[in-house]
Amino acid sequence: MSVYHGKTKKRQMLEVDKQHWLPQQVQVTLHALMGAAKEGLLALAVAVGLDVLRSMMEAEVTAIVGPKGKHNPNRKAFRHGAEEGRVVLGGRKVPIQRPRVRTKDGQEVRLSSYEAFQDEQLLTQAALERMLHGLSTRRYHHGLEPVGDDLPAVATSKSSVSRHFVAATRKALAELLARPLGDQRYLVLMLDGIEVADHTVVVALGITDDGQKQILGLWEGATENATVCRALLTDLVERGLRVDGGILVVIDGAKALRAAVRDVLGARATVQRCQVHKKRNVLDHLPDEARAWVSRKLEQAWRETDYEKARTALTSLAKTLDDKYPGAAASLREGLEETLTVLRLELPEALRKTLRSTNPIESAFEKVRMASRNVKRWRNGQQVLRWTAAGLLEAEKGFRRIKGYRQLPMLSEALSRHAAPEASSAVQTA
């Protein structure tokens, strides 16, 4: 057993000796890091990071005033002790002794190495990412990377985290509302609303001519009314949204949205009603025992590859519903032809499946709901907008090209054909 311990001690000495390959400025003793190592690799990394930062600051001081203990008659500054400072590491502020330097006339010399680690944008971004992934302000410190038991931390209180999160979401909202849209050709515009507390936020998602999805804007109101929808669309146009070559607008079926599209975008917009919303609206007028077969009939009609056959099937279904369920029949007839726009444009199946509904926005809404599930009190519309914008932009990071994007030139051509006669008709009328 004694031999075993002897070998262990010898092995530890060899491990310590291996540090000699490191540059002198970044050498750290293993014994000083053993405690941090117990907290895991992240704590070890923070400990090493602090040690490297100390070496960097010392190197910068030496570059300014010269080596310690060596007289330099030409130096313009001198060492002035040290004081406690704070740097940002691991999503919080941690204390560190920072060296001070003064000029001959007593002016403080700022150390760039120290200031680089004081950037509070790192805290703001850390707060944003953690809270968007469901961590509440009260439990924020539980979600931080370990930095070691012997290292105190600040800027992790509920109020501090909340301030940083507000700053981050305010910035996200401002950037989203200021996005220029004139540099891209958007073939598709999807519009849908999400309810947050007593507020409704109408969101616009665009699909470019190469199949990329992008959040274009959002507008808040008490309901999904025409004024709110018109304001959103007007904002998009003012930021450069082009519809001169035609654009497919996929909407959830709200009359306010339909009216706003007509008023702002005019004849250049070709409207596709969301089939998912339409089915939901029709089924809401039916008793449970009738929903299954009506749902099957709707899906069969929408799966048709011929526009006239699909239209005939839906019209026939509406007649069947007339006697027993007139509310469902009326709901189906309202905007019936616009649920078939992707068929009328003769788009291939892959594109039809993608553009038949507002599901791409709905998937982004799920991210907003997940991110904001811990919010217990909604104070105002600005708070709702900030959270929604931040959640949407987080969802946008995971966006992929739509299925069928290689067939988008067919959509572009179809939209141009549709927009041209409408535009010439409008000119003749004028």
Model-derived segments and their meaning:
Residues 267-284:
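Inter-helix linker motif
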Residues 50, 54, 58, 137, ...:
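Amphipathic alpha-helical transducer elements in NTP-driven molecular machines
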Residues 2-7, 63, 69-70, 77-80, ...:
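RNase H-like nuclease fold core
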Residues 279-306:
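Conserved phosphate-handling catalytic cores of large alpha/beta enzymes
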Residues 1-152, 159:
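Dynamic "connector" segments at or just before major functional cores
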Residues 1-36, 48, 54, 58-62, ...:
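Acidic/histidine-rich catalytic cores and adjacent linkers
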